[in-house]
């Protein structure tokens, strides 16, 4: 199955992540939003605690394990394991963990970054960071041509 939306999803999430790096008040198409500042993690234990909290919110205690990954190329999710390149500062951010956790929530239905994944991503973002953050992400998806979600 092809993953034709991958580049657009990554571009949208990069825009959203940059907004989270700043956080705080934001004028958003005439509305006043307050975005959270995204968390940055210093070690694997903090990442695991964060993912454990996301799992607990969904009633899935211990469902996902976080482990280090060699290199700096990319984070990855497969079979209940999130692999994070710890040497890469970009990978130790909340937006990356939420992206990989959304793969778990999507359960592999459809293309890796298709409508089911994007719907799952919006769901976990709303739960972890609030409706404002999810709204900004949804708008970034729209701006990058991948606004349709399942």
Predicted feature residues:
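Walker B catalytic acidic pair
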Residues: 100
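Active-site-proximal or metal-binding-adjacent scaffold patches in catalytic folds
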Residues: 1-95, 104-150
């Amino acid at each position: 199955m092809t993953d034709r939306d991958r580049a657009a999803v990554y571009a949208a999430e990069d825009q959203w992540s940059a907004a989270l790096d700043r956080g705080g008040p934001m004028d958003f198409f005439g509305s006043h939003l307050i975005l959270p500042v995204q968390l940055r993690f210093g070690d694997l234990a903090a990442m695991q605690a964060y993912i454990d909290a996301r799992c607990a919110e969904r009633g899935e205690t211990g469902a996902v394990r976080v482990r280090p990954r060699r290199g700096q190329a990319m984070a990855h999710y497969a079979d209940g394991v999130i692999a994070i390149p710890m040497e890469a500062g970009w990978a130790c951010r909340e937006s990356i963990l939420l992206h990989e956790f959304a793969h778990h929530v999507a359960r592999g239905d459809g293309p890796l970054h298709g409508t089911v994944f994007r719907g799952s991503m919006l769901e976990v973002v709303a739960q972890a960071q609030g409706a404002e953050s999810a709204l900004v992400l949804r708008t970034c998806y729209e701006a990058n041509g991948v606004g349709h979600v399942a």
